[in-house]
Structure formats: C-alpha cells, structure tokens
Swiss-Prot record:
Its cofactor is a divalent metal cation. Accelerates the degradation of transcripts by removing pyrophosphate from the 5'-end of triphosphorylated RNA, leading to a more labile monophosphorylated state that can stimulate subsequent ribonuclease cleavage. This is RNA pyrophosphohydrolase. The lineage of its organism: Bacteria, Pseudomonadati, Pseudomonadota, Betaproteobacteria, Burkholderiales. The gene is rppH. Its EC number is 3.6.1.-. Keywords: Hydrolase. It comes from the Bacteria. CDD domains: NUDIX_Ap4A_hydrolase_plant_like. InterPro entries: Nudix_hydrolase (IPR020476), NUDIX_hydrolase-like_dom_sf (IPR015797), NUDIX_hydrolase_CS (IPR020084), NUDIX_hydrolase_dom (IPR000086), RppH (IPR022927). Residues 6-149 form the Nudix hydrolase domain. Belongs to the Nudix hydrolase family. RppH subfamily. A motif (Nudix box) lies at residues 38-59. One of its GO terms (molecular function) is pyrophosphatase activity.
Amino acid sequence: MLDREGFRPNVGIILLNAHNEVFWGKRLREHSWQFPQGGIKYGETPMQAMYRELHEETGLLPEHVKIIGRTRDWLRYEVPDKFIKREVRGHYRGQKQIWFLLRMVGRDCDICLRATDHPEFDAWRWNEYWVPLDAVIEFKRDVYQLALTELSRFLRRPAQRTDKSRGPRAPRYPRVANGHAASETPAAIDTSAVCSEVEPGANALDETPPRVSLRD
C-alpha cells in the first residue's frame, strides 16, 4: 500500500526499559541492528500496526508495554534505487513512519524473537538512548535521529547525549533468539558463532543490505 507520492505507511518503535536504555534487534543472519518497524496494513490504525509489529518482532504483548509518546506527524525517508527491487522501481520511493516511544513494564524474559514463523531478529540488546547511529543503514539515519530527538521530551529523566566514541557502550550482554545471554563474559563470546556480539555503531554495515520490496 503506497500513498500518492510512493511512500509506504509504516510504524517505528523505540522501546525503553526502566533505565531509558533502548532495544536494538539484530537482523536475521545479518550484521546490522535496528529498531522494530513494519508496514501498516490496509484498514489498520498506526497504533494497531504498532502492537502487531511489536509482537511479531519482539514477542511482547500490549500488557508488556506502556505508550509514552508518538511523533506528531509522518517522518519520511527515501530508499536509493539500488536497494529497491526492479519490479517496484518508479513506484516505490520509501517509507513514511509514525514512531512510538514505549516503556517496557514486563520483564526481559517476556521478549521472544521467535513469536512468528518469520522472525526479523536473531539477537537483541539494550543500549543507551543516544548512541551513534553508525549501525543504521545510511538512508535511515536522519529519520532515526528525528524520531529519537522528537520523542526524547517524553523521557522521565532526560537521556544525556554523549560524544565519547563512535560506537555505543554495551551495558548488557547480547541476547540470542532464545532470550538467554550469549555469554557470561564479553571475552568469552565467540563472534564467529554468536552474531549478537556485533554492536550498533561497530561494524554492523559490513554486509550489503537486502533489496527492498513492497513486502518489507
């Protein structure tokens, strides 16, 4: 479903824990991390789409979260032609998104990346609110920054920006799809076997992103 300008209606989700840390998911079989997001189906409201995508991508239910804010209007990004499948070029331009800021009121163990037969993520972790966005594919960085900035006014305690490094601190061990910590100590993680060790802001864009279709 595209609008007249070629943008697909979409929702994005910034999920916080009690420490104002943000959920990042590692895309299935890729070394890239992102926030949960997905298209709005015909007949859905943005809120309905948000709850559906939240469950499909994280396993969380409405009772596990509290809505604390949303963007006032659509935030748009265009997808470069080289990432668009040939059959939709000339029609599809990108995404227009309503972003929701959620507070998780459930427990970490409520997160399940295999809630559906077609999971989006195979690992997840919490990171600081203001991490460098190097891990985000370049054409999405501006919309991520806009969403984070607009929604930061809803935080209970303002999250402080940091310019310490090009990569984020890793306050929690990465979790693999079964929800358990990948390792007891960072040094013990075998990055060849556990992809979840790759952090947003590190080398998460080493692989070419998949091409975009209208189903993405």
